[in-house]
Amino acid sequence: KRRRGGGATPRPPAPAPGVPRADDAGARAAREPARSTAPKGIATGHTPVLAAELLDLLAPAPGQTVVDCTFGDGGHARLVAERLGAGGTLVAIDRDPHAQARFDALAAEVPCAVRFIRSGYAEALEALGAEGVRAAAVYFDLGMYSMQVDARDRGFSYSYDAPLDMRMDPTEERSAREAVAEWDERTLARVLRDYGEERHAGAIARAIVRRRSERPIETTLDLVETITGAIPAPARFAGGHPAKRSFQALRIAVNDELGQLDRALPLAWSLLGVGGSIAAISFHSLEDRRVKRFLAGRAQGCVCPPELPVCVCGREPEAELLTRRSVTPSPEELAANPRAASARLRVARKLREEETG
């Protein structure tokens, strides 16, 4: 019988050793997971977003290998590590050197084996694949983490004055200050439009070029003043802080966040054994669309033209979507952690290895 991508998903084959399949009840719950409050009492002092939902869908189990691509404050990693037990392994990735100290503290407290890779996650996943690592789960918590936002010397926030930096890896060459000083007006406008979805990108880019010709833009407050002055007065008080989209755009560009994600998703998928799962928590539509498109492509079956009476392509889905729609925080979690408001979680399970040749 012909099967198209929108049809019933086939039952997954038996998972590889070390990658157990969720039981039927768990699988049903995973398809439409109930929202719940985030776990409390995390030793890092950081409340991980959508943590209960992530654990429910990934179902990390003793003896598995799990890869955390965005260690950050370590909140998700700690909860996962406690599930892996003495026979499991957690591989943590982060390009921010400040994450290393938090990882070292966590490593001394969790039962599983641990490993830290200081690198962009695309490069780290490629290296893990070259080593032959196989994982039961790989997950991403995209964007900034709390300590980056709250560290005044990092320049991520428009809420207080600080050096205009925004680098997740402070050893990288170009900071946001250098970007606004060096990029031409067309490049600035494109970055603000494409990465910030900023309606007033052209006006803001012109204002930046005009301002820097008079005096340097060196701090976050310098940039906020420049952006605010370029936006029409009625628009300054609609849709949140007037600099929000521009700061997002510059941060994404400086850190190549979307390029990293585009390269990392197929690499993460390749690390998974059959029955393993990939998850991503995103905080804006640019990330979420990429994750959604990637997972939907893996879950697609027949691609024959609709006029053909039977399938001749023979294509079978590689993935089962465990989240038909993105999972969002519960009202209780939002009350406890307003920063979670824009979070979206998507998860898929690997049904078979990719076809080659």
Language model: regions and residue ranges:
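S-adenosyl-L-methionine-dependent methyltransferase catalytic core, i.e., the SAM/SAH-binding region
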Residues: 1-357
